[in-house]
Amino acid sequence: MSGAIYGIGTDIIQIERVEGVMQRTHGRFAEKVLGPDELRIYQARKARSERRGLAFLATRFAAKEAVSKAIGLGMHWPMTWRAVQTLNLPSGQPVVRYSGELADWIAQRGLHIQISVTDERDYAVAFAVAELQSKLSA
């Protein structure tokens, strides 16, 4: 399924910093950074607990940064905040979904990205591995 490592990326962010940005932007930061599926999940978590909402937002921000590093683009076109979403399978495993021109860019290079995200009281962390998909068919 996967082959050689194309790149790795990691990011850590202080959740309090995300809280400050949300206050300064009156909540618009979440709309700028999160994709549509992530935004729905964020809003549901925030409705249950402000802290859970902030932790979710922080992990997704860190995931986008980690992915941008793993694919070697940083935050430059076609890598945009909303073009990458980190969602969860029913098992809880986080998975990366791409859209738009970034999806084409990823497909052209034959990449697959693995992601891990976690948060603790003060910090959110993400680690991404971009792999070249094997050309061999099963």
Curated annotation (Swiss-Prot):
Entry EC no(s): 2.7.8.7
Signal peptide from the UniProt entry: none
One GO term (biological process): fatty acid biosynthetic process
Nucleotidyltransferase found in the keyword field: no
Family matches, as SUPFAM superfamilies: 4'-phosphopantetheinyl transferase
Primary localization: cytoplasm
Binding site for Mg(2+): 11, 65
GO MF term list: holo-[acyl-carrier-protein] synthase activity; magnesium ion binding
Keywords for the protein's UniProt record, in alphabetical order: Cytoplasm, Fatty acid biosynthesis, Fatty acid metabolism, Lipid biosynthesis, Lipid metabolism, Magnesium, Metal-binding, Transferase
Domain of life: Bacteria
Reactions performed catalytically: apo-[ACP] + CoA = holo-[ACP] + adenosine 3',5'-bisphosphate + H(+)
Coiled-coil regions listed: none
Enzyme class: transferase
Keyword Transferase belongs to the record: yes
GO CC terms, sorted: cytoplasm
Requisite cofactors: Mg(2+)
Cell compartment(s), UniProt: Cytoplasm
HAMAP family hit by this protein: AcpS (MF_00101)
Function: Transfers the 4'-phosphopantetheine moiety from coenzyme A to a Ser of acyl-carrier-protein.
Family the entry assigns: Belongs to the P-Pant transferase superfamily. AcpS family.
Name of the protein: Holo-[acyl-carrier-protein] synthase
Organism of provenance: Ralstonia nicotianae (strain ATCC BAA-1114 / GMI1000) (Ralstonia solanacearum)
Taxonomic path: Bacteria, Pseudomonadati, Pseudomonadota, Betaproteobacteria, Burkholderiales
